[in-house]
């Protein structure tokens, strides 16, 4: 699979409310690899996982920030019917709603879903899906709830344990350094009882370490 497929769900259009979706979509074309990222996805994945990735790449997420409470109720009920109340799972319903609704709308849907079903949407995804699709849907939910919290978790697990996922570490720190890295640092400290700065300092070395720490800023 081409290197272009590596990254986080926030690389897909529509997750960063401060960035233009079409600009992000163009940035993901991956021309240096001789094909678009969508071509890579179709060539290297299959099933509902492939379908979800393609929907995310197509940048059809509703940009309207207004909340239609009737539509929120309808989507929450549809997800409940497609999962917990169904023998088997209607994966297409999850893919359509998760891949096309606005960020602000989905946050309300997740709240309404909890009210209707008594379950967090993450619990339902865990029970009703599996494998790569489950992991992708959970990543979408995390990023919808909070991009900084999702990326803080991504950075933590890029460095936790033996070895370091240098690609993810560089990608996130560099791409978010002028967007929301301070908020990511706050979430990192809150959720992992250590600072992003100190973990980078202990997990990297040389000029690579110096560059990342410079972008990261001072110790929290």
For each feature predicted by the language model, list its residue ranges.
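Structural signature for extended repeat/solenoid scaffolds and their inter-repeat hinge/linker regions
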Residues: 1-220
């Amino acid at each position: 699979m081409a290197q272009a497929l590596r990254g986080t769900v926030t690389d897909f259009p529509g997750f960063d409310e401060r960035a233009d979706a079409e600009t992000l979509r163009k940035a993901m074309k991956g021309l240096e690899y001789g094909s678009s990222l969508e071509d890579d996805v179709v060539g290297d994945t299959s099933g509902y996982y492939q379908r979800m990735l393609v929907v995310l790449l197509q940048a059809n997420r509703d940009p309207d920030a207004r909340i239609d409470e009737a539509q929120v109720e309808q989507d929450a009920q549809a997800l409940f019917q497609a999962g917990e109340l169904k023998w088997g799972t209607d994966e297409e319903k999850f893919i359509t709603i998760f891949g096309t609704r606005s960020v602000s709308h989905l946050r309300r849907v997740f709240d309404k879903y909890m009210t209707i079903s008594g379950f967090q949407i993450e619990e339902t995804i865990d029970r009703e899906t599996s494998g790569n699709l489950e992991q992708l849907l959970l990543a979408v939910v995390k990023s919808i709830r909070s991009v900084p919290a999702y990326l803080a978790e991504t950075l933590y697990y890029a460095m936790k344990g033996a070895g370091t996922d240098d690609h993810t570490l560089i990608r996130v720190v560099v791409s978010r350094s002028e967007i929301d890295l301070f908020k990511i640092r706050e979430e990192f400290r809150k959720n992992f009882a250590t600072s992003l700065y100190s973990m980078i300092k202990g997990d990297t070395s040389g000029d690579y370490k110096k560059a990342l720490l410079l972008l990261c800023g001072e110790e929290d």
